[in-house]
C-alpha cells in the first residue's frame, strides 16, 4: 500500500484477518463471536497530517515510508475525506508563489467534517508576524470564494494565530438523531466518522434497557456521553483537557441534553475522589453519591487502564470498554474477567489496511 493508492480490492481479506486475530486474542476470556463493523474502503479519514517538502520553486505534501523511512510525494490521499482531497492541490497552488506563506512551512494538518467544514493548520519553523496574518487572511478569503467552509490557523513555537475560530461543528446521524459535535483543532477526535457512527450506535444498542446512571472516563468532547445520555437517567463524565471539556459543554447545549455532567479531572483523580483519598475543589456542588452508576464506560489511551482505575471499574455491574489497542485490553481483561464476563464483542475497522484494530466489549458482573 502507498499513500496514493489503497488496495480496495483486498478490503474484505484484511477485515477477515482482523476478525480472526481478534477471535484468537479473546478466546481465553470466553468471548462471544465477533460482530464486525466495516469502514468505507476509501475517503474514511476525516483528518490528515503531512510534512511539506520544498524543492526549488515547488513544494508538496510528503509522508515517510514506515520501513525504509524514505519520503513519498503525496498529491492525493484516498484514505482522507473527499473534502481534504479537493482542497490539497488548491491549497498548495496558492502557497507555492507566496513567499510569505511558504517560508519555513514544514507541515500542514487538515481536520474535516461530514458537514462540509474544514480546519487547515499551517506549521512553521519561524516567527509569524502581521505580514503572515495578512497573507493568510487573503488565502482564507480566496479559498472561501471557491466554496470551502475553511478555518485557517498558523502555528509556530509557542505561537498560535487563529484568524477566526479553531473549531468546526460536525453533525452525525446516530440512531435517527442528528448529533452535533464541536471539534477543536489539535484535540482528539475520532478519525473515521463512518466507524464513529457505528460505534455510537453499537454502544447505544449494548446499553438499551440499562438501569440507573452512567459514568464515563476519558469523555473527550462528549462523543459517547451525549449519544448514550438517552439510555440513562444521568451521565457523569470526566475529561482532563480544557479544550475538550469546553467543547463537551457546548455539545451538551447544542444537543439540548440536560442529564450530562462533565467534570474536569483525570481518571486517576476521579478514582481518588470516589475512594475518599482526596477532596477536590472541582467537585464542589457535585454529590458523587447521588449518582447510581450501574454502568461505566471507558475508552482509555493505548496504554489501557492503570491498576487503580481497573480496580475501581470492577466495582460496577456493567462495563462498556472501547479499546484502540487489543493488547492492553487483553491485559486488563485478565483482571476484569475474574469478576465479569464478556457478553458482547465488536470489531470496528477504524484503520483499514493497517494492523491496528479498534474493538468494544460489554462486560457484565458474574
From Swiss-Prot:
Q: Which domain of life is it from?
A: Bacteria
Q: What EC designation does it have?
A: 2.1.1.-, 2.1.1.35
A molecular function (GO) held by this record is: rRNA binding
Q: Which residues form the active site?
A: 324, 358
List the InterPro entries: MeTrfase_TrmA_AS, MeTrfase_TrmA_CS, SAM-dependent_MTases_sf, TrmA_MeTrfase, U5_MeTrfase_fam
Q: Where are the transmembrane segments?
A: none
Its Gene Ontology biological processes? tRNA methylation
What NCBIfam families would the database entry show?
trmA_only (TIGR02143)
Q: What does this protein do?
A: Dual-specificity methyltransferase that catalyzes the formation of 5-methyluridine at position 54 (m5U54) in all tRNAs, and that of position 341 (m5U341) in tmRNA (transfer-mRNA).
This protein is called tRNA/tmRNA (uracil-C(5))-methyltransferase
Q: What is the lineage of its organism?
A: Bacteria, Pseudomonadati, Pseudomonadota, Gammaproteobacteria, Enterobacterales
- Gene encoding it? trmA
Amino acid at each position: 500500500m502507498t499513500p496514493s493508492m489503497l488496495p480496495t480490492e483486498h478490503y474484505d481479506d484484511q477485515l477477515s484477518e482482523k476478525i480472526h486475530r481478534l477471535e484468537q486474542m479473546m478466546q481465553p476470556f470466553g468471548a462471544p463471536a465477533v460482530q464486525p463493523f466495516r469502514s468505507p474502503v476509501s475517503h474514511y479519514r476525516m483528518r490528515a497530517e503531512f510534512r511539506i517538502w520544498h524543492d526549488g520553486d515547488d513544494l508538496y505534501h510528503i509522508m515517510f515510508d514506515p520501513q525504509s523511512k524514505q519520503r513519498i510525494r503525496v498529491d492525493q490521499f484516498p484514505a482522507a475525506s473527499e473534502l481534504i482531497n479537493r482542497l490539497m492541490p488548491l491549497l498548495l497552488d496558492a502557497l507555492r508563489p507566496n513567499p510569505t506563506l511558504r517560508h519555513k512551512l514544514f507541515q500542514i494538518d487538515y481536520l474535516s467534517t461530514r458537514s462540509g467544514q474544514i480546519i487547515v493548520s499551517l506549521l512553521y519553523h519561524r516567527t509569524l508576524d502581521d505580514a503572515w496574518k495578512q497573507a493568510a487572511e487573503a488565502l482564507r478569503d480566496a479559498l472561501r470564494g471557491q466554496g470551502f467552509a475553511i478555518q485557517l490557523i498558523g502555528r509556530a513555537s509557542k505561537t498560535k494565530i487563529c484568524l477566526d475560530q479553531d473549531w468546526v461543528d460536525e453533525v452525525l446521524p446516530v440512531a435517527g438523531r442528528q448529533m452535533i459535535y464541536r471539534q477543536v483543532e489539535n484535540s482528539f477526535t475520532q478519525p473515521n466518522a463512518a466507524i464513529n457512527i457505528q460505534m455510537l450506535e453499537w454502544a447505544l444498542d449494548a446499553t438499551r434497557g440499562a438501569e440507573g446512571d452512567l459514568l464515563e472516563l476519558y469523555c473527550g468532547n462528549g462523543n459517547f456521553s451525549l449519544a448514550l445520555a438517552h439510555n440513562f437517567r444521568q451521565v457523569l463524565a470526566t475529561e482532563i483537557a480544557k479544550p475538550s471539556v469546553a467543547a463537551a459543554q457546548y455539545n451538551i447545549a447544542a444537543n439540548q441534553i440536560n442529564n450530562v455532567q462533565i467534570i474536569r479531572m483525570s481518571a486517576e483523580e476521579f478514582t481518588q475522589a470516589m475512594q475518599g483519598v482526596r477532596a477536590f475543589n472541582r467537585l464542589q456542588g457535585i454529590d458523587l453519591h447521588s449518582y447510581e452508576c450501574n454502568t461505566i464506560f471507558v475508552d482509555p489511551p493505548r496504554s489501557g487502564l492503570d491498576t487503580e482505575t481497573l480496580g475501581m471499574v470492577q466495582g460496577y455491574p456493567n462495563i462498556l470498554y472501547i479499546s484502540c489497542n487489543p493488547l492492553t485490553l487483553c491485559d486488563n481483561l485478565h483482571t476484569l474477567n475474574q469478576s465479569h464476563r464478556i457478553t458482547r464483542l465488536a470489531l470496528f475497522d477504524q484503520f483499514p489496511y493497517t494492523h491496528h484494530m479498534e474493538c468494544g466489549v460489554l462486560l457484565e458482573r458474574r
